[in-house]
UniProtKB/Swiss-Prot annotation:
Family per similarity comment: Belongs to the thioester dehydratase family. FabZ subfamily.
Main location: cytoplasm
Pfam families cross-referenced by the UniProt entry: FabA
Organism per entry: Haemophilus influenzae (strain ATCC 51907 / DSM 11121 / KW20 / Rd)
UniProt entry keywords in alphabetical sequence: Cytoplasm, Lipid A biosynthesis, Lipid biosynthesis, Lipid metabolism, Lyase
Enzyme Commission designation: 4.2.1.59
Name of the featured protein: 3-hydroxyacyl-[acyl-carrier-protein] dehydratase FabZ
SUPFAM superfamilies given in the database record: Thioesterase/thiol ester dehydrase-isomerase
GO molecular function, one term: (3R)-hydroxyacyl-[acyl-carrier-protein] dehydratase activity
Catalytic activity: a (3R)-hydroxyacyl-[ACP] = a (2E)-enoyl-[ACP] + H2O
Highest taxon in the source lineage: Bacteria
Function as written in the Swiss-Prot or TrEMBL entry: Involved in unsaturated fatty acids biosynthesis. Catalyzes the dehydration of short chain beta-hydroxyacyl-ACPs and long chain saturated and unsaturated beta-hydroxyacyl-ACPs.
Catalytic residues identified in the record: 55
Gene3D superfamilies, A to Z: Hotdog Thioesterase (3.10.129.10)
């Protein structure tokens, strides 16, 4: 029995899937995914991230809202790779519940983003999202996207 090769998506293809651009494109690479089920991606955190100028001077910490946005973008990539859209259709970030922050994300960290489908109904898909650094949970949340 042979192991299946990971399905990697590089930044160039990510930019064909998501409308976001610098400084708000927050997924650097997809490491692997299974259509309709789960996706694993990374975001490398540089000291040069624009948010560190004010959050916080002398003590840079990635804002929690950007961690959640990175998870939402990973969710979007999985949605776009899973479904064929009709002209003009998009996936929109529709909701977030039970967000918890467990450790700070700092310059030099590599944040791993894991999203998994938990429920689909009437054009809305619910996901769990977990962001980790070195195996430690930085953030976890339930996320939803809507197809419109």
């Amino acid at each position: 029995m042979s192991e299946q090769q990971p399905k990697v998506i590089e930044s160039k293809e990510i930019m064909t899937l998501l409308p976001h651009r610098y400084p708000f494109l927050l997924v650097d690479r997809v490491l692997d995914f299974k259509e309709g089920e789960w996706l694993k991606a990374i975001k490398n955190i540089s000291v040069n991230e624009p948010c560190f100028t004010g959050h916080f001077p002398g003590e840079p910490i990635l804002p929690g809202v950007l961690i959640l946005e990175a998870l939402a973008q990973a969710m979007g990539i999985l949605a776009f790779k899973t479904h064929e859209l009709k002209g003009g259709e998009l996936f929109y970030f529709a909701g977030i519940d039970e967000a918890r922050f467990k450790r700070p994300v700092l310059p030099g960290d590599q944040m791993e983003l894991n999203v998994q489908v938990i429920k689909k109904r009437r054009g809305i898909t619910a996901f769990t999202g977990v962001a980790t650094v070195n195996g430690e949970i930085a953030c976890e949340a339930k996320l939803m996207c809507a197809r419109r």
